[in-house]
Amino acid sequence: MYDKIDKNQYTPMMRQYLTIKENYPDTLVFFRLGDFYEMFFNDALVASKELEITLTSRDAGTNNERVPMCGVPYHAVQTYIEKLSSKGYKIAIVDQMEEASNKKIVTREVTKIITPGTNVDELYLSEKDNNYIGAIDKLTDGYAFCYIDLSTGETNVTTLPEHIDYFYNELQKLNIKEIVTNDKFPKAYRDYLKN
């Protein structure tokens, strides 16, 4: 979607955002603007709903187009990231790499990607739950299943019988935060995992 937008109709800052968003289409982009992390377009719609924060809009282009926008204060961002991550969202943190100046657009870069299963930052983890990421692959007569808590180093590898219900039961029991599969894994099962 974002790669098909004519960026020339937008302000330099919004072009910068859209360029970053092109590289992270399935990720909520937290874009640092001064003392806030802002989200735009569809990210703003999703974040405002999930975080129950106000959705506003911003003038973003030469044709006075206003785009959806919401934001959170930088000093409280951890709380919001934890909420979104616990709901299964991936987040890209885009920080300002220099002080703002009136002469040019501030350089910004993605400084961190947070996913439900790869999160190792104590700020975003719950002390009472493991933070497992799992991987599953189809074997000739069953499934290979590995799950790891990257924050503690705990690693488990096992095989599961052919019937996928065993796998579903393991997912429920372990509260896996994120699953990695490949294209050979049956589509019906991948669709189930998305839920």
Regions found by a protein language model. Name each.
Residues M1-N195:
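Basic, polar low-complexity surface loops/patches
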